[in-house]
């Protein structure tokens, strides 16, 4: 099956801090990531969790260009993934306070998975995150 959800652009750039963006020039802060593999198909699913989205705060999304995908940028270049799921989590007394956002996408090809993992290692190191295997 061709991989239509993830594209990888390789351009070596000087040390660039890894970022995750929905909108051009508006880096988001990742709260958690969950990685899963379908044992039958071998497809891998990534689920990003964000406690806040800068794109939503103060309606900044109206002033920045939407990519139509989530972009992961680092010194190796850019990964573009089309979300397969996007869930907004609300809470608070009135139920209208944004408590988080979950964004999922699939990776079908091994070389794209390896590239994604290199990005995640860089992102984790730059942001004080640690990988924990729950298998």
Stretch-by-stretch model annotation:
Residues 2-102, 107-135:
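Long, contiguous binding/interaction regions
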